[in-house]
Amino acid sequence: MNSSDWKMFFLTCADVLGPGDLLPFRNESWCSWTTFSRLRSDAGYWQSGLPRRADIGDEWIGDGGVWGQPFAYADIAHIIIPREFHWRGILQGALDEGIKQQDIDVLSSELNKHAIAHRKTNLVLEMKFY
């Protein structure tokens, strides 16, 4: 997967799934991802909304956006986009929660139009490179 494919992947996600945010209750989209660097360190994953169009660069996800720090496309090892995600937050002074749906079927169809390889199950759409 080259940088232009990654850029198209993230732009397609932004267009199909909507804007992301750091907090799930303010999101239209949600994902988990890890990098090769992090796999070598602690094997952890980050969670956040998908990057907004303004965060998506030619070679990386930019600093200070939805993901909070830069991520080079070449370092992304695995990204998971769930069909639905649970959110919880304080809205109008009260705890609220719910489930949001993500149309990974439409996303998969759009990614196929751009020849971007991915895997889709009944639970997630993912790209894994390890």
Regions found by a protein language model. Give the residues of each.
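Structured alpha/beta or helical-core interaction and ligand-binding surfaces enriched in interleaved
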Residues: 1-120, 130
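Minor-groove-contacting beta-hairpin "wing" of winged helix-turn-helix DNA-binding domains
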Residues: 125-129
